[in-house]
Structures are given as C-alpha cells and as structure tokens.
Amino acid sequence: MRCRIAESDVELETPLVRAEVGSTLLIGIRAGDILLATVEPAGLSARNIISGRVLSVVQRDVIVVVRVNCGVEMEVHLTLAARDSLQLQPGHAVWLIVKTHSCHLMAAS
C-alpha cells in the first residue's frame, strides 16, 4: 500500500491495512530502523528509498541523531562508527532506506 506523507511529495510503501482511499493514517517509523546511504542504493529488497539532505548531525551519548530533509524532516539514529564511516555533514546528499515492515500503523481516521 502506498501512503503519501501529508503536505509533501514523499510516498512510503507500507504493509496493507484496511483503509479507505484518502483516509488519514498515522504511520510510525523508529529512527533506529532507518538506514542511511551516501550513494544511491540499488538491488535492495527495501521498498522505500528516499533522497534527502542532512540538516544536522548531533551526538547524544552513544547515539548520533541525524536530521534529514527529504520533503519532510526525518530523524535517523546511528552508531558513532556509522557516523564516522559515512562522514556525514550538514548539506550532504543521502538516501534514507526504510523496509515496508518498519512502517507501523499507529492510527487511522
């Protein structure tokens, strides 16, 4: 099932749910379930590959919080090692990778 994020062009493939076309759904994605790539990925089973730009990279203890603008603002949690190997900086182009089953229906109306 394809769902458009409100007030954006971003679409996510989510698990099938019983919802009317045009319904409002609240979809939750854990920040730690989002992968980041610095080159456009190919040949993946993940159905959601979204391009964006890094807004900020902030270390909070042993977690790195990366904020990405991909038409909407998304928060991604990385390890220190992942941050270091990706060499992320604000303004860098990235791709967010989200498996369909990492998109959880929280509410529908």
What kind of region is each of these model predictions?
Residues M1-R2, Q59-R67:
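Short aromatic-glycine-enriched beta-strand elements
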Residues R2-I5, L16:
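Short charge-dense sequence patches
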Residues M1-C3, S23-T24:
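Conserved active-site beta-strand-loop modules that form the wall/rim of enzyme catalytic pockets
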Residues I5-V10, N69-E73:
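Glycine-centered tight beta-turn/hairpin loop motif at sheet-sheet or coil-to-beta transitions
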Residues D9-V58, V65, H77-S109:
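Glycine/charge-rich catalytic "coupling/switch" loops of P-loop NTPases
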